[in-house]
Amino acid sequence: MTSSNMDIAAVDEKLGLSRNQDEVVFRLFAPGEDQVSLVLFEKYDDESGENLAMLKKSNGVWEVSVPNDKLTKYYAYSASSSGEIITPDPYSQAVVRQNHFKYPSKSIILPKDNFDWQGDEVTSAAIGDLVILEAHLRDMTVHSSSGTQKPGTYQGFVEADQRGGISHLKDMGYNAIEFLPLQEFGNIEIDYKNSELSTWNDWNPYEANHWGYMTSFFFAPEIYYGSDGVKDRGVWVGQEGRAVNEMKEMVRALHKEGISVILDVVYNHVSQYDDNPFKLINKDYYFRLDEAGEYLSHSGCGNDFKTENTMSRKMIIESLLHWMNEYHIDGFRFDLAAMIDLETVNAITAATQAVNPNIILIGEPWGGGGYNPRELADHGWASWNDHFRNSVKGRNPRENDYGFIFGKLWDGNNTEHYKKLMRGYLQSEGGHFKHPAQNVNYLESHDDNTIGDFIRMSLDKVGATEVVTRAQVAQLSSEEITIHKLAALNLLTSQGPVMIAQGQSWGRAKVIANSVGSDQNAGQLDHNSYEKDDETNWLNWDEKELNHDLVDYYRGLVAIRNKYAEIRNVDTGYRQFINGSSELSFGVNMTGENQILVLLNGDQKAVSEFSLPPGIWTILANADRADTKGLGSIEQVAEVAEQSGLILVQKE
């Protein structure tokens, strides 16, 4: 049987560890191997263990059964192709690892699951109603200003009586969180400028990957965020598998507050520097290779996972279902989704919706030179809308590439194009999406400059390579706040779900901290902080108080959006546009149970005058404040100040 036939024959096999009443069965798909053994270890740091020969089936799956009374705590595989390197199970649900860029690891045989979910289930929130906070779990609590007793951990994230973590989500009214990767990843990278190594690292003096887009194990939670997680070199971590239940406890606590949990997942490539199981076993099967057998890297991350192969697709789907069933995850954001073949995209949609019809599927619709938000929409996915992002703020302040909030129309577009973006960028109007709920609008993500730094550079507050301190830039000027508020009003009155990045609500700066002493860019504004587990990324909650005026505005806008469904998702037939006296202004009239009128003026120099539909209108938001209780009333004519907006309501 050929390898291509083997994977089809093996697709229904349950891989990894399976429990029967009296025994545990171990299975590994490795059709190219001549010999595979299961290795059982009593201790996590044992260099050798008990080897049990595995039987190779005709479909390329190796299998062995072990009676319950013969089980140990840890296991791995020894395969002919990996030499002396033992290989953890690629389906590991928990691992113990030694902190080193190669990450020697063993799989943990967890006790039978008895976690008490206390009646918790996935949330039933509709994607179009979401206000998503994109956040790094550690960044949200590790700074001393958070007041957390267990900083940087799953447990710390949901502590009561703190300023960060779950308290911040509740304070702002966010109803979803999108965590940067929580699957076990290679957070220690190759030594800096070590000539004894085969790879010369002259780009990462931090020797780290902070964000997590280097997945090592697709079924296991990240150890570093557990109560036993440390990053000290040479130390073994995760011996007890504590991260498993601690992550479940975090999800349960978030659900109790009505907050949906979305995981950022990476299936387009795997970890680069550690001994990844998929690289040690079945490299030729699981990766896209060139003619010389070397890894292709259109992802830009050292390798490209071959999602189109049957067993690759099986792993991706079973990984997603594992997080849904075992961790009650409500949705996923897919990194570089354009690199996932559409047959796999379709299979993901079918499999996840069979478990949860309301599953949230969001693609980052680019990668490897591709760009496919329209195709993802046709397969039922939502996508980040970079057209909205660029049209509102611009693309690159270093190139004087500005958008609406700076009095410009990005990329030669006109206000008619801007209106299409505000009503969901629908395929029926030449856009990407079949309906507004697929349109995830945002202004900032973990990538690139924060919108705060974008505005700082655009106003020449800070040069692109200028060295500053946080104290110099943390407090926003009135000019900066004006632009921030217009951006926030644009975002939070757009159709479909919206995403807000951590720290966005106070215009945070990413000033490169000099934590390693060898970063030549220390003190500059950072546009790619993937490697920095320091104050470059950590949220300083004092800055939230420092810029409370902008924070209050965001909080008020979120409350208005949550209260009035017309703002979030109304049929196209119930949205009409009106023009203001300025060419850089327009209004959106949305009708449902209530009539909502949003007026926007991007003009930097002129007030825009709007003739209002008949009746008395209550002001919900103006240039300074946003409040569901109202800020007075207006009729006939509205004057919208430069670089500002209004939200008006007329109850039916």
Stretch-by-stretch model annotation:
Residues 138-158, 162-327, 337, 344-356, ...:
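Substrate-binding/active-site clefts of carbohydrate-active enzymes
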Residues 30, 71-75, 631-652:
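C-terminal beta-strand-rich structural cap/linker in extracellular carbohydrate-active enzymes
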Residues 28, 77, 135, 179, ...:
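Conserved, mostly hydrophobic/aromatic
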Residues 47-59, 213, 325, 336-434, ...:
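Active-site-proximal helices and loops of the catalytic beta/alpha 8
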Residues 22-26:
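Structural beta-strand segments of beta-rich domains
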Residues 28, 34-44, 606-624:
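Beta-strand-rich binding/interaction modules
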Residues 436-617:
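Loop/helix patches that line or flank the sugar-binding groove of alpha-linked glycan CAZymes
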Residues 1-21, 46, 56-153:
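The feature marks proteins involved in alpha-glucan
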